[in-house]
Amino acid sequence: MAHFTLLRTDFVEPPSTWLEAHVACIRPQGSVLDVAAGKGRNARWLAQQGFRVEAVDRDAEAMQAMRDIDGITLQVADLEQHGWPYADHQFDAIVVCRYLHRPLFPHLIDSLAPDGVLIYETFMQGQEVYGKPSNPDFLLKPDELLEAFQPALEILAFEQGPQESPKPCMLQRMVGRKRRS
């Protein structure tokens, strides 16, 4: 008898626990940009909380999982090859989880409204022990988010180091509020 394994392509991971812990920093019903949104684990949850979400990712197929969800606008864009499509936009919050492209850092700041919040979480050096990503280009150095976003942002929360959930990894996490000019 043959055994088959079905791969669920519609499965969406739960939202980032870091995002869940700091969502109260975002203006209620505000506009949120979810960078590298994928299938929308964070965008879906944010929309359910009443936020107006713009989800951007280069993978149009993955983003199709969100096409019929109220409160989410989809933008297919390769941010590494074709630049930043939000030069004329400002958001109440920008969420970046498990994605790193350092040339975007200044654009993230510019696209935050005054008092807007950046919630960032991605892998850092030491992740090589746990698996991918292991390429140093995709791993933050210790304190790199702090160095990249101060003084433009007031740092509200920061942590770095090993995380056990949902699976062991090495993360750097930051929440920062854009200072008024």
Question: What is each model feature region?
Answer:
Residues 59-61:
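Conserved SAM/SAH-binding beta-strand->alpha-helix loop
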Residues 163-181:
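Core SAM-dependent methyltransferase catalytic element
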Residues 1-27:
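S-adenosyl-L-methionine
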Residues 30-38:
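Conserved class I S-adenosyl-L-methionine
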Residues 116-123:
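Conserved beta-strand signature within the Rossmann-like core of class I S-adenosyl-L-methionine
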Residues 112-114:
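Helix-to-beta-strand junctions that scaffold the AdoMet/dcAdoMet cofactor pocket
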Residues 70-82:
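Conserved SAM-binding strand-loop segment of SAM-dependent methyltransferases
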Residues 84-93:
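A short acidic, Gly/Pro-enriched loop at the edge of an enzyme's catalytic core
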